[in-house]
Swiss-Prot record:
Biological process annotations from GO: cellulose biosynthetic process; UDP-alpha-D-glucose metabolic process
InterPro entries in UniProt: Cell_synth_A, Cell_synth_B, Cell_synthase_bac, Cellulose_synth, Glyco_trans_2-like, Glycosyltr_2/OpgH_subfam, Nucleotide-diphossugar_trans, PilZ_domain
Region described as Cyclic di-GMP binding domain: spans on this chain: 732-1518
Active site (UniProt): D186, D330
Organism this protein belongs to: Komagataeibacter xylinus (Gluconacetobacter xylinus)
Polar residues compositional bias, start-end: 768-785
Catalytic activity: [(1->4)-beta-D-glucosyl](n) + UDP-alpha-D-glucose = [(1->4)-beta-D-glucosyl](n+1) + UDP + H(+)
Recorded domain comment: There are two conserved domains in the globular part of the catalytic subunit: the N-terminal domain (domain A) contains the conserved DXD motif and is possibly involved in catalysis and substrate binding. The C-terminal domain (domain B) contains the QXXRW motif and is present only in processive glycosyl transferases. It could be involved in the processivity function of the enzyme, possibly required for holding the growing glycan chain in the active site.
Positions of the PilZ domain: 569-668
One annotated GO molecular function: cellulose synthase (UDP-forming) activity
Extent of the signal sequence: none
Protein name (record): Putative cellulose synthase 3
NCBIfam families referenced in this protein's UniProt entry, alphabetically: CelA
Length: 1518
């Protein structure tokens, strides 16, 4: 696109040899920017971010020691990368919207930070490559040189200020017949006219002063005709070579409309003069003129600054003259010309010098005008809009305009800590560590990089002081101008004033003084909070952080206040330090050669060895000649002091020619301001020290208050009334210099005149306290002062089936589920109940309920009671006895006919405490039923009915809540087919049992009593010992117990046994009411990953009605019992940056005058973690009517709830708790109690934004949802490795595990592969692997299967094995777990496993995307116990990491193995995860991105610079 990247250097040679120099520059830029953006958006743990930050800061410090623009561009890219990571962190991790106030404050701070980041980017863009344009030579033929009009506009400035500018303009080194100097006097003062006549300058006035300075210039353009116009403000005196060094570019480039030069100020600005050490700091304007404008020139976006510039008449007239719509006519004029396609240029050489604003208040006024003007341009002629500008120019103008919006962001940064210290609002929700590793590197990189770029033009931290001095004044201007851009007028900045005495300017600093007082109060509040108040760790950290923030803000504000300490200014003509060779001739003709120390329009100091005290009072002639500059000076002066080899002289100007010569000597020299940038390179620490030194200036003794003398007139003296000219348009043409006198002739006359100077008159030097300033002396500076410091019923037809043996059992309410304490009934919640379960193979013959508890003694006995019912049948009533509020034990017999399988025991409370009316929410309306109350049931067994159609009865009773046991009989041969079939049946029972505890004790013989399942080849299928005729299922009596039943799963071969098992589990509804049946095989559909029926689909929204019945989502009363929504998820759902999943919930509550919907609410919790509360208030009228037309949820109140991924597990439960309040219906008004509230079954859960991806090994995923084995519902990608001859304990553990799998997936394990340990070596297992057995049983297979585990089991001990390769380095990057895992100590693990169970997870040695989970231990019983722990909810939190040891009831978890991953992510998300877990890779990727971007940008900038300046000799270093 732009040709080759490089032309010189080592990089160029390398790229040329590899052919990469022909790659377009946009390629590395795009690649680098994309990589930087990706790296910038990756979130990592703060501790890891700390290492990344250390790396970037170290690199910055190393590279910053090397010079070169390529390094600078790279450091800019690196800085932007660090800042991008910071702002992304701020936006995604630190913002909490708890209330409207915190929201407003947090958003305001974020906007301020966004502004700061935008400003940083724009600054880098502007200053990336200053052009460093040099002067263009003029044609040798002077006849080709153009005519030039020089305009010096004035309004109310004093003549003494304007004289020097006009005389300097008249003395420009340019052909006299082509130089026209005009005074544009909007003040119409006769004195100015007379001076113009005397000096030979032109003089222009107009009839009406419209549009201020812009109008004045437009009028002058209308009455003059030169092709070029040069503009000087009335205090800007040019050097003689101004035109010779600038016009060349205007002639060489006919498309150039403007060439701007710097505004240099030879007098110190308020910051330099008023701050201690301020003179050692670059002037406030230096950065703009020394760096920004030069950068703008690179982009062809130089701003016109109103003075010291050459304008092409054709260009400015083509836009209708100078812009008059805003108060910054200069910048707006340049914008208009550039919209028309004109070019601009900037020559970074100070060719004129003027006066800076003397006082802070004047400086503020000037900046207020600039701010108003730039904001006006933004509103009225926004450069980001409209045609005519390239994008680079738009960005440059955006930078200039947006700069003056700094006031609100600056103030926001200063006062933000007050939000916490005074209002208690935490607007940055982050730990100090996180802030340190994100914010501090951002600030550090910005400061150091800007310091490198700005160098000697602007010192670090001083921009903050400059902005703070103006901020509070600019806030109002910023807002008003944004809203009303046409308001505001042009104000002339006063210059050249004097101060008789120093004083503190309250008018300029009082806003900051008030702000400092507020910050001091905040500091005291912070210290008080840290020292004397008691806080938790987080609160203490917040106090410390915000207090430090206040200290930083206070330092900046105090430094800005120090600027208001105005120092004495008694010189009308500031001194300029310069060393010039001069010759001083006294009255006796004695010539003394010397060098000046300083000069001014008032005098000079000359160092000469011949100075003697007797010269004081005498007159001398000072001669200075510079053939190079064409300056010849010979002006008389009076000796004021002569000592220590220094003569202090005051000019004794006799006429206009003398005055011109003095101006020429002081201002006309071509190198007069060459030292404008002679400041030491910026060093941030030194600069910070200067800030503290400046603050120390406030501690100096305050000077006496004094009237403010703004100019040289005496106190009480009124300005003289100036004679004005008539209001009319008038043009006085300038007199050519040749018609006045030539420069050579002037020099000759001067020499002759000096030869006639008489002897000096005897005169005493004035006393030191005399200023030497008089109204008559336009150069009135004596130059001698010292610079100042700055649960059915029995059917009779089946009664003969009942056994004679009765069993009695007593259950407390705790056993029935009241685990949280007594049942509490209240006026607004009068109903509580429990489930009483009677086993399906038993019938109740006698039942008794025994209750204890208490009733409120404040209730009326005749109107209060607790009614007890069982399945809506009356059982009894508890009466109130105010004298004895406690009751019990009270017993009630219950009719056995009331009982069914699942029974509802309910308690209904009716309470009143007064006879007229009652408040249901009164705290005295209560009753409590003790959780130690009990029910005693006597039951007998029913003769079993053996029919296959009743399966899974009698083996499984769905009403049972206690642990279920299903004995299994297996042959002792360890047949693999029988094992697979038994496992399939066990998983079917597990799927039916779901959350209930279930175990499968294994034996090789029929148990002595009870029921059992027998699986094997060629088993008897009837009492006569008949054999199967094929795959067969049969229910036969237990030969040892007539009440027991044995389910036989058999066939003639092992394959037929498996067919019988599949028929049992997949088509039990087709078996019919028979005791035995030969079955056929079942055809099964191919399963797909994550299609387990237990799992909520993640590819579509899921209705609540798909998970539970609608009745489960509704309740009665004002505070119904909590509603629950259980659901299962695959635990490997991964979202980008932990983005929450969404729940669209719709709730319904009775309308009308029943429930106070405004104060009623529904609380939503996830896995007992509170999420959010929502009002039951309906939507607005318009939304309500629109929903009736298009919404299926009409009448419901909708809410969207975020479900955080870190609160979601394999097994989950949403809880909804309604808390409604009745409407206040007045006294003695009945409040309806039979109300219903519900969660709409059409509410949805949406997990579509999740990807299946997980970090392994992770035993918590296995314990929660059998992951990763449950990924395939039929376990078709799972292999179970058992000992070759497993005992009953190991086989029982296997079946229990299959039951666990079935419960986890709700699908039988039809695809599982079972193999022996000895088969592993010949046939490596596929897929995910489960290993069951002791180390002795498994033999060498165990070590092979666990080859990638860091653990070794040997000699009844488990130890950490030898690490290999770079694994030790990997450990450095492991995360720190806070859930009780013993990270970092496992290297010394050497634990005995005697009488212990071991659960271990590792990566498969056969497939890096597969896992191995091993159940092992000292004995098979320990392994069985460990498997049973998977069904115990209380044990699940202890099962995590990659190793679990179970000793008795105690679990110990460890994590040692390196992390591996399973699943897949899109490429961009995989990279995000990878970089987020590998800080070194993140660091290197960031550097690569910054390097690529910097390489491309550097090459592009370099090429652009070559095109901007075609000749190498006309630009600086590229």
């Amino acid at each position: 696109m732009y040709g080759t990247w490089f032309t010189t250097g080592k990089v160029t040679d390398l790229l040329a040899r590899t052919g990469l120099d022909r790659v377009p520059v946009w390629v590395p830029v795009v690649l680098g920017v994309v990589l930087m953006a990706f790296v910038g958006s990756v979130r990592i743990d703060p501790a890891l971010q700390g290492w990344v930050s250390i790396g970037t800061v170290t690199l910055l410090l190393v590279l910053n020691r090397r010079r070169g623009r390529g390094i600078t561009v790279f450091l800019m890219m690196l800085s932007l990368l660090v800042s991008l990571r910071y702002i992304v962190w701020r936006l995604t991790a630190t913002v909490q919207f708890s209330n409207w106030l915190q929201t407003a404050l947090a958003v305001l701070l974020l906007l301020a930070e966004a502004y700061a980041l935008m400003t940083l980017c724009l600054s880098y863009f502007q200053m990336a490559w200053p052009l460093r344009r040099r002067e263009h030579p003029l044609p040798e033929d002077m006849a080709q040189w153009p005519s030039v009009d020089v305009f010096v506009p004035s309004y109310n400035e004093e003549l003494s200020l304007v004289r020097s500018t006009v005389l300097g303009a008249l003395d420009l080194d340019w052909p006299a017949d082509r130089l026209n100097v005009y005074i544009l006097d909007d003040g119409r003062r006769k004195a100015f006219h007379d001076f113009a006549v005397e000096a030979g300058a032109g003089y222009i006035i107009r009839a009406e002063n419209n549009h201020a300075k812009a109008g004045n210039l437009n009028h002058a353009l209308a009455v003059t005709d030169s092709p070029f116009a040069v503009i000087f403000d009335c205090d800007h005196v040019p050097t003689r070579g101004f035109l010779r060094r600038t016009i060349g570019w205007m002639m060489a480039d006919p498309n150039l409309a403007l060439l701007q030069t710097p505004h240099h100020f030879y007098a110190p600005d308020p910051f330099q003069r008023n701050l201690a050490g301020g003179m050692h700091v670059p002037p406030e304007g230096n950065m703009f003129y020394g760096l920004v404008q030069d950068g703008n020139d690179f982009w062809d976006a130089t701003f016109f600054c109103g003075s010291c510039a050459i304008i092409r008449r054709e260009a400015v007239m083509g836009i209708g003259g100078f812009a008059t719509e805003t108060v910054t006519e200069d910048a707006h004029t340049a914008l208009k010309m550039q919209r028309r396609g004109w070019g601009t240029a900037y020559l970074r050489e100070p060719l004129a010098a003027g006066l800076a604003t003397e006082r802070l208040i004047l400086h503020i006024g000037q900046r207020v005008r600039w701010a108003r003007g730039m904001i006006q341009i933004m509103r009225l002629d926004n450069p980001m809009l409209g045609a005519g500008l390239r994008w680079e120019q738009r960005l440059c103008y955006l930078s200039a305009m947006s700069h003056f919006l700094f006031a609100i962001p600056r103030l926001t940064f200063l006062v933000s800590p007050l939000a916490f210290l005074f209002l208690g609002q935490n607007i940055i929700a982050a730990s100090p560590l996180a802030i340190s590793v994100y914010a501090l590197p951002h600030i550090f990189h910005s400061v150091i990089t800007l310091s490198r770029i700005e160098g000697r033009w602007r010192y670090s931290f001083w921009s903050e002081i400059y902005e703070t001095s103006l901020a509070l004044f600019l806030v109002r201007i910023t807002i008003v101008t944004l809203l009303q851009p046409h308001k505001g007028k042009f104000n002339v900045t006063d210059k050249g004033g004097l101060l008789a005495r120093g004083y503190f300017d309250w008018d300029a600093v009082y806003p900051n003084v008030i702000l400092a007082g507020v910050l001091c109060a905040a500091l005291l509040r912070g210290v008080f909070g840290i020292v004397w108040q008691f806080h938790d760790r987080l609160a203490l950290q917040s106090f410390i952080l915000n207090t430090l923030w206040v200290v930083i803000s206070l330092i900046i504000v105090l430094a800005s206040i120090a600027v208001g300490r105005e120092t004495r200014q008694t010189r009308n003509a500031p001194r300029v330090s310069v060393r010039l060779p001069v010759v001083v001739t006294d009255a006796h003709g004695r010539q003394m050669e010397g060098h000046t120390h300083d000069i001014s329009l008032g005098g000079l100091a000359v160092g000469t060895r011949l100075a003697t005290p007797d010269m004081v009072g005498g007159e001398v002639t000072v001669r200075y000649d510079s053939a190079r500059d064409g300056i010849h000076v010979g002006v008389p002066a009076r000796v004021l002091d002569a000592r220590d080899g220094t003569l202090r002289l005051r000019w004794a100007v006799r006429d206009l020619e003398d005055e011109r010569q003095v101006v020429s000597m002081v201002f006309g020299r071509n190198d007069a301001w060459a030292g404008w940038a002679d400041f030491a390179p910026d060093r941030p620490l030194r600069s910070l020290a200067m800030v503290f030194r400046s603050i120390g200036g406030l501690l100096r003794r305050r000077p006496a208050e004094a009237p403010r003398a703004l100019h040289e007139m005496g106190e009480g003296e009124l300005p003289a009334t100036e004679e004005k000219l008539e209001k009319q348009s008038f043009v006085l043409k300038p007199v050519p210099r040749s018609a006045r006198h030539g420069a050579t002739a002037s020099a000759a006359l001067f020499v002759a005149f000096t030869a006639l100077v008489p002897a000096a008159m005897a005169q005493e030097a004035p006393s030191p306290d005399q200023s030497g300033v008089t109204a008559e002396t336009p150069f009135g500076d004596s130059n001698t002062g010292v610079v100042p410091d700055a649960l059915p019923a029995i059917d009779p037809a089946v009664a003969d089936r009942i056994s004679d043996a009765e069993v009695t059992r007593t259950l407390t309410f705790r056993n029935l589920g009241a685990t949280t304490g007594p049942l509490t009934l209240r006026g607004y919640s009068p109903l509580q109940g429990l489930d009483v379960v009677v086993p399906a193979n038993r019938v109740v013959t006698h039942a008794q309920l025994t209750l204890s508890g208490a009733l409120s003694p404040s209730l009326l006995p005749e109107a209060n009671a607790v009614t007890v019912t069982l399945n809506e049948q009356y059982v009894g009533t508890l009466k109130v006895d105010p004298q004895h509020p406690q009751f019990g034990p009270v017993s009630f017999d219950i009719d056995p006919l009331y009982f069914t399988g699942d029974n509802k025991l309910n308690f209904h409370f009716a309470g009143e405490y007064r006879r007229d009316c009652n408040d249901l929410f009164n705290e005295i309306l209560w009753a409590r039923i003790s959780d130690m109350s009990r029910i005693t049931l006597t039951t007998v067994r029913i003769t079993p009915e053996r029919k296959l159609s009743r399966l899974p009865a009698p083996f499984f009773d769905p009403n049972q809540r206690s642990t279920l046991r299903v004995p299994v009989v297996l042959p002792a041969t360890g047949d693999r087919g029988a094992l697979r079939a038994a496992g399939l049946v066990a998983s079917w029972f597990g799927r039916i049992a779901d959350f209930r505890k279930l175990s499968f004790p294994v034996s090789t013989t029929i148990p002595a009593s009870g029921n059992a399942v027998e699986v094997g080849v060629n088993l008897p299928v009837d009492a006569e010992g008949g054999r199967p005729a094929g795959p067969m299922l049969a229910e036969v009596a237990n030969p040892n117990d007539r009440w027991g039943t044995v389910l036989v799963v058999t066939g003639r071969t092992a394959q037929e046994v498996e067919v019988a098992a599949r028929a049992l589990v997949f088509s039990p509804d087709t078996l019919g009411g028979v005791a035995s049946k030969v079955v056929s095989d079942v055809s099964l559909e191919t399963r797909h990953p994550y299609d387990a029926p237990a799992f909520v689909p993640t590819d579509r929204p899921v209705r609540f009605g798909e998970l539970v019945g609608a009745a489960d989502l509704q309740g009665g009363g004002f505070a119904p019992a909590g509603m629950t929504l259980p659901f299962h998820l695959p635990p490997d759902l991964y979202t980008w940056r932990g983005r929450p999943f969404l729940m669209n919930m719709w709730v319904r509550a009775p309308g009308g005058p029943v429930v106070d919907l405004e104060t009623s609410r529904v609380d939503v919790s996830l896995n007992n973690n509170y999420l959010q509360s929502y009002t039951l208030s309906p939507p607005g009228l318009w939304r309500k009517w629109s929903e009736r037309l298009v919404n299926q949820h009409a009448g419901a109140v909708g809410h969207v709830t975020a479900l955080p991924p870190w609160l979601l597990f394999g097994q989950n439960q949403l809880q909804f708790n309604f808390d409604a309040r009745p409407i206040d219906r007045g006294a003695c008004r009945r409040t309806p109690g039979d109300i219903h509230m519900s969660v709409d079954s059409d509410s949805t859960l949406d997990f579509r934004r999740g990807y299946h991806f997980a970090e392994m090994p992770n035993l918590s995923y296995f314990a929660e949802a059998a992951f990763p084995f449950s990924r395939m519902a039929d376990l078709s990608e799972t292999t179970v490795v058992l000992p070759d001859h497993p005992d009953t304990g190991t086989t029982g553990a296997f079946l229990d595990l299959m039951g666990f799998f079935g419960a986890s997936t709700w699908y039988p394990a039809a695809g599982v592969t079972v193999m022996g340990a000895d088969e592993v070596a010949q046939t490596p297992p596929k897929g995910d692997i489960v290993v069951l057995g002791t180390a002795a049983q498994l033999g060498g297979a165990a070590s092979g299967l666990l080859a990638r585990s860091p653990y070794v089991i040997h000699d009844r001990h488990i130890t950490v094995g030898q690490r290999m390769g770079l694994q030790g380095i990997w450990y450095l990057f492991q995360d720190h777990d806070h859930a009780g895992l013993k990270d970092g100590v496992t290297a010394n693990l050497n634990a005995p496993i005697a009488e212990a169970g071991v659960l271990l997870a590792a990566q498969s040695p056969y497939d890096s995307q597969r896992s191995v989970v091993a159940f092992t231990g000292d004995t098979p019983e320990r392994i069985h116990d460990l498997v049973l722990s998977l069904r115990n909810k209380g044990d699940l939190p202890s099962l995590q990491g990659d190793l679990v040891l179970k000793n008795g009831d105690r679990f110990t978890s460890y994590r040692t193995a390196p992390v591996y991953t399973v699943g897949s992510l899109p490429l961009w998300l995989r990279l995000d995860w990878f970089l987020g877990h590998h800080p070194s890779a993140l660091y290197l990727a960031g550097l690569a991105g910054a390097g690529l971007a910097a390489l491309g940008v550097w090459a592009w900038l370099r090429g652009w610079s070559r095109r901007r300046i075609a000749r190498d000799d006309l630009t600086g270093e590229l």
